[in-house]
Amino acid sequence: METWKLVNPPPNTILITNKWVYINKWDKLGKLIKYKAQLVAKGFAQYPGYDYVETFSPVICMETICAVLALMVKNRYQIQQMDIKGAYLNGILKEKVYMKQPEGYNDGTRWVCELIKMLYGLKQSGCEWNHKLDSKLKNFSYTRLYSGPCAYIQCDRDNTSIITVWVDDLLLFTSGDDLMQKNEGKN
C-alpha cells in the first residue's frame, strides 16, 4: 500500500504514536460478518506548523441542503446518497510526518515510519480529503458554489446535477436518469 517508508529518524524528530483499533462488522440481521483492524495515528500529539498546517474541512450548511431539496421537489430531480469508503485515506499528505513503528511491525531497529499517505487520526486528514474531492469534482466540470463551499453544480445541455458534501457522505441530485448513471461511474 506504500503508506509509509522506514527511515532513520532525522535529528530532533518529534514522533507521533499509533494504535490498532479493532472493529466488528455486522449485517442487517445482527450477524457478525467480519473483523476489521485499522491503524490510527494519535494526531493529538501533532504540533501546528511542524507536522500539520491546515485542518479546516467545510461541511454543507443546513440552509443549502434545504434550498437544494426545494429545487429537487420543484424540478422533480432524482436523489442518491453515496458514502465514500476510506475517504480520509485518500488525501495527499503534504507535510513530513514521522511515526513510531506500529505494534507487531517493529523490526528491532531505531527506524521510524515516514508517512507517505494519510492515516485516520492525523489532524489534516479531513482537510486534505476535502481538497482532493474538490479537485476531482472540478475535473468532472463541477463548479463549487461561492455561497456553499460543499455544494457543486454541473449543467449538461438540458440536465443539471448538484452534489452536496458532508465529510465523506455525498448527496447527488440530478434532473435525468442518464446523468445519474454517468455520475455513479465517476467515483
Positions of PLM-derived features:
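Long, low-complexity, charge-biased intrinsically disordered regions
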Residues: M1-N187
